[in-house]
């Protein structure tokens, strides 16, 4: 659970530390607003992706399943600034052909995105959760994102995108499976 009172007090302390008056008209409600925002932005902290993946269907489908361009936003754990982009997920069902509803994969993305996060770990967590939850033959995850910590501060390079991947099972072992996945996520239309 979140300690909203501690968040409010911390925001008030930051405002004072930067020389602002937390009681002035535009800032009076800021600590409360930030506490509510953090409760929403970090709601994945209290969610278990295994629960989302528990319900599936054994359809005998043995071919690659891909959902691409899943939009997300998250908060960089280094600066607490947002990063956002898209996630592409592919998996190859196991011998039973167990699949899940495609919205379940988007929910797994949301759970891991709504935590203080780094993009590399997020890709790994999504891939591991799907591999463990579906017991599939393979999982591929590619994340493309723009990080506000590179846009607003430091190097200040808007438009630069970070791409990370996590490959498990057949996607890690088979260059053909990996190439097919990468080709399909590049396909426009």
Curated annotation (Swiss-Prot):
Quick one: which pathway?
Cofactor biosynthesis; 7,8-dihydroneopterin triphosphate biosynthesis; 7,8-dihydroneopterin triphosphate from GTP: step 1/1
Please name the PROSITE patterns in this protein's record.
GTP_CYCLOHYDROL_1_1 (PS00859)
- What does the similarity note say? Belongs to the GTP cyclohydrolase I family.
Which species is this UniProt entry from? Answer: Dehalococcoides mccartyi (strain ATCC BAA-2100 / JCM 16839 / KCTC 5957 / BAV1)
In the Enzyme Commission scheme, what number(s) does this protein have? 3.5.4.16
**Gene3D superfamilies to which the protein is assigned, alphabetical:** 1.10.286.10, 3.30.1130.10
Name of the protein described by the UniProt record: GTP cyclohydrolase 1
Q: Which GO terms describe its cellular component?
A: cytoplasm
Protein's GO biological process:
one-carbon metabolic process; tetrahydrobiopterin biosynthetic process; tetrahydrofolate biosynthetic process
Q: Which Pfam families match?
A: GTP_cyclohydroI (PF01227)
> What GO MF terms are annotated?
GTP binding; GTP cyclohydrolase I activity; zinc ion binding
The UniProt catalytic activity note for this protein reads: GTP + H2O = 7,8-dihydroneopterin 3'-triphosphate + formate + H(+)
Against HAMAP family, the record matches this protein to:
FolE
Q: What highest taxon heads this organism's lineage?
A: Bacteria
Assembly with partners or alone: Homomer.
Keywords from UniProt, A to Z, are:
GTP-binding, Hydrolase, Metal-binding, Nucleotide-binding, One-carbon metabolism, Zinc
User: In which residues is Zn(2+) bound?
Assistant: 76, 79, 149
């Amino acid at each position: 659970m979140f300690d909203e009172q501690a968040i409010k007090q911390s925001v008030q302390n930051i405002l004072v530390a930067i020389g602002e008056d937390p009681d002035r008209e535009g800032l009076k409600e800021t600590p409360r607003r930030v506490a509510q925002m953090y409760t929403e932005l970090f709601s994945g902290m209290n969610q278990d992706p295994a629960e989302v993946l528990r319900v599936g269907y054994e359809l005998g489908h043995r071919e690659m399943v891909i959902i691409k361009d899943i939009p997300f936003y998250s908060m960089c754990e280094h600066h607490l600034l947002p990063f956002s982009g898209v996630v592409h997920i592919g998996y190859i069902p196991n011998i039973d052909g167990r699949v899940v509803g495609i919205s379940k994969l988007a929910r797994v993305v949301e759970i891991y995105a709504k935590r203080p996060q780094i993009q590399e770990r997020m890709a790994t967590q999504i891939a591991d959760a799907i591999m463990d939850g579906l017991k599939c033959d393979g999982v591929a995850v590619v994340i493309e994102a723009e990080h506000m910590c590179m846009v607003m501060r430091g190097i200040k390079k808007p438009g630069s995108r970070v791409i990370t991947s996590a490959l498990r099972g057949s996607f890690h072992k088979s260059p053909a499976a990996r190439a097919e996945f990468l080709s399909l996520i590049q396909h426009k239309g």
